[in-house]
Amino acid sequence: MPEGEMMHKLQDIIDRKLLDSRRIFFSEPVTEKSAAEAIKKLWYLELTSPGQPIVFVINSPGGSVDAGFAVWDQIKMISSPVTTVVTGLAASMGSVLSLCAAPGRRFATPHARIMIHQPSIGGTITGQATDLDIHAREILKTKARIIDVYVEATGQSREVIEKAIDRDMWMSANEAMEFGLLDGILFSFNDL
């Protein structure tokens, strides 16, 4: 068996074992493709054992807001309680995903980092003034949605969150817990 084929088969075995233990690892940027994979896994677990807990482990630099909110909405729709665990990094939309679990179910590993900020538009935007105005209004609506998530999750005031996300705000796991983004630090997955 060629080495590449063997590694692919090994990855399939690992993925199967993780799904059997009701763990989903989201270890990549938030894209339409990564969101679709996460949603498929969530629904597979929901359909095979509705209401049974799921652990959603996040290590993501962030990415697409729309793709991230697609995952968020699915987690909120299923009956299975989801626990989020940040390991490594949850930045930007990754930090928003870490908050989709119910209060008391949001954790990080000791050396995890979380970064929150306001949304941005990448690349160059060109077009008519009215089109640019439409884009500007849309990003402000997106910013308001993200602020709402942080306010609800942390219990902080809207003013505190607006100030916090004005620029990139980096936090250790302990700092994120003090800010209200996390409910605890995990030293062992046996603690779940």
UniProtKB/Swiss-Prot annotation:
Tell me the Gene Ontology biological-process terms attached to this UniProt entry: protein quality control for misfolded or incompletely synthesized proteins
* Reaction(s) catalysed (UniProt annotation): Hydrolysis of proteins to small peptides in the presence of ATP and magnesium. alpha-casein is the usual test substrate. In the absence of ATP, only oligopeptides shorter than five residues are hydrolyzed (such as succinyl-Leu-Tyr-|-NHMec, and Leu-Tyr-Leu-|-Tyr-Trp, in which cleavage of the -Tyr-|-Leu- and -Tyr-|-Trp bonds also occurs)
The UniProt keyword set, sorted, is:
Cytoplasm, Hydrolase, Protease, Serine protease
Which residues participate directly in catalysis? 92 (nucleophile), 117
Q: Among its keywords, does the record have Cytoplasm? A: yes
Which Pfam families does the entry mention? CLP_protease
The answer to keyword Glycoprotein applying to this record is: no
Which top EC class is given?
hydrolase
Which InterPro entries does the record match to this protein? ClpP (IPR001907), ClpP/crotonase-like_dom_sf (IPR029045), ClpP/TepA (IPR023562), ClpP_His_AS (IPR033135)
User: Disulfide pairs?
Assistant: none
Q: Which PROSITE patterns match?
A: CLP_PROTEASE_HIS
EC number of this enzyme: 3.4.21.92
Subcellular locations according to the entry? Cytoplasm
Q: Which GO terms describe its cellular component?
A: cytoplasm; endopeptidase Clp complex
Q: Name one GO molecular function term.
A: ATP-dependent peptidase activity
User: What is this protein for, i.e. what is its function?
Assistant: Cleaves peptides in various proteins in a process that requires ATP hydrolysis. Has a chymotrypsin-like activity. Plays a major role in the degradation of misfolded proteins.
HAMAP family named in the record: ClpP
UniProt record similarity statement: Belongs to the peptidase S14 family.
Q: Which NCBIfam families match?
A: PRK12553.1
Q: How does it assemble?
A: Fourteen ClpP subunits assemble into 2 heptameric rings which stack back to back to give a disk-like structure with a central cavity, resembling the structure of eukaryotic proteasomes.
Q: What is this protein's name?
A: ATP-dependent Clp protease proteolytic subunit 1
According to its UniProt entry, this protein's organism is Chlamydia muridarum (strain MoPn / Nigg)
